[in-house]
Amino acid sequence: MKKIVGFTSGYFDIMHPGHVMMLKECKRYCDYLLVGVNEYKTKTKQPDGRYKNEPIWTPHERLYMTDACKYVDEAFLYDGEKELYKFLKNNQDNIDVRIVGADHKEHPFTGEDLNINVIFNNRDHDYSTTNTIKE
């Protein structure tokens, strides 16, 4: 029987319980969870027009922590939305489901035009990197 391959992505900067909850939920939809870690090192504008703050951990530190999560089968770095789109386009036949944050239901996201089944995950917690930094 074919294994279901799932994909999700993010910055995973200052890994917190909310990230782990999200990855656990992602793993429920697949047998093999592939996670892209955005390597961007500076404040960046997202496809939906929002901005992400400059990461605190280096890309390799964020990759290390993400890959160590027991729900992640494989993690890799990608350098920005153009590289993510290229990866998704080249692998759309190998990815059975893409799990995207529920906040993207109302906003555009990279690769939404590709032939990959999309599931929007829940965010039923108050954890956030921004709030953690403020505390």
Kindly label every feature range from the protein language model.
Residues 1-135:
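Nucleotidyltransferase catalytic core that binds NTPs
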